[in-house]
């Protein structure tokens, strides 16, 4: 009987923490467990939500130095006792841990990197963490722009593989009565819903969208309303925040206070699916900040899976996550006038759901898992 490959994943990004990186790491462990024995060193609270076939050991989430120390010790213990074939860091944060532990058992070392993993402007991180990227045997990146950043960070190109994040494809459309009930519950009947999903950070740029794009959209489409699902992150590392209060205050200053509604964090996936299918456009106004790039833009793929088009800027990995004219429209970075026109175009001349969903099918989590497994060989 052929021995199954053993993969040890070290990550701080797992549910119950909320965000794209958390979903990605969960699915990475889940998909790899279909082909290999998978163990994970993750944050406190993640064991209760782990994939069924995965064995997970927890480390304290905070303070960060304690998480890193405990995770390193646990990874070293597993390296010696379990002898994994591959030790994979779920982000740049745990890349040094993966490399160090790999040296104890002869395993191949790897990391899945996002753009911010490489560009974060922290002297300690850049002097200690970043140099480990080029030492790894394999570097997996989430987009073409992230690959370019990795090469600029002196990672050899032959070590790098692009594996785009995945998406859960819905088995069927949401029932019309549930969509109608959702709209009635939140006072959205007969509204043109511009949906924003995700953490409220400086990079995501929702406050700037409200100031620079929403007034013109509302002038042309008086029933337009931005519906925000998400909140400012509490445990994210290195992310500047925009509070819901600051965005609402900007809406008041811009004369569009009645055209934005905050629904908070939505954990229930069925309700989130209804929100996607109730909406008319997914607005994804990520700002172009060279030191804080958007690595990919998973939420755009999630929207596309439900037939919802995105309006976004051509910045970071979004150029891989949104296909212009097929799953939405892309405006030149930080060009809010052009972004407004694209939103109006999608409201007035919608792209067919079938075309949008066809694009999303190429990002199924099964494809993601196969890509990661191939990159680790």
Predicted regions and their residues:
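Conserved donor-binding/catalytic core segment of Leloir-type glycosyltransferases
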Residues: 8-10, 188-204, 210, 214-215, ...
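A charged, aromatic-enriched C-terminal amphipathic alpha-helix characteristic of glycosyltransferases
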Residues: 35, 334, 348-377
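Short His-centered aromatic/hydrophobic patch
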Residues: 89-95
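A short, active-site helix/loop in glycosyltransferases that binds the activated sugar's phosphate group
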Residues: 136-159, 167-172
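Nucleotide-activated donor-binding/catalytic signature segment of Leloir-type glycosyltransferases, i.e.
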Residues: 230, 239-266, 270
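Acidic donor-binding loop of glycosyltransferase active sites
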Residues: 259, 265, 277-292, 308
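Short hydrophobic beta-strand element within catalytic cores of glycosyltransferases
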Residues: 300-305, 309-312, 322
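Conserved acidic donor-binding segment of nucleotide-sugar-dependent glycosyltransferases
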Residues: 323-325, 329-336, 343-350
